[in-house]
Amino acid sequence: KVKNTMAQNDTAKNGNGGNLGFEADLFKTADKLRGNMEPSDYKHVALGLIFLKYISDAFEARHKALLAEDAQAAEDKDEYLADNVFWVPKEARWSHLQANAKQPNIGTLIDDAMRAIEKDNESLKGVLPKDYARPALNKVMLGELIDLISGIALNEEGDRSKDILGRVYEYFLGQFAGAEGKRGGEFYTPRSVVRV
């Protein structure tokens, strides 16, 4: 559903000149799921999950390619790191989290996934959010958000995948900035500046 929406909404524009498609629909749906949570808290929940989906999709694409070449290489962490792909342990892969999205312990599973990814990827140590198990976070909402994010294809070929991730992050940050009562320019760097 999200993939089809991207093509249908190509004509809408955001404030930075980027095409709006699935980002707006994704944010509207995700925003409804947040309940009474403050946008400043919710952004970490949503963006952390989107990043997790992105690295898991990249890992799975590389894993599939390596399996076709050499099954033994597919289990070698260095094969992924050599291609600038994060190693994602089995318990941290999106497919595992999606399969368990409706479980009452989904918050703990996500926190454990983030810890496992940090453990196996030095550059991510201490960076990923690990507070999905907190009691104040509605686990039903969290499971629904996982299902929603599962519809985003973040494993496109080459730079297109990074562009999709960037579009989602940029749009979400702009929306969160507005929800927090700040002008978007005070909250994140616009696309035009990033390219400079």
Each language-model region and where it sits:
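Non-catalytic, mostly N-terminal accessory regions of nucleic-acid modification and defense proteins
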Residues: K1-V196
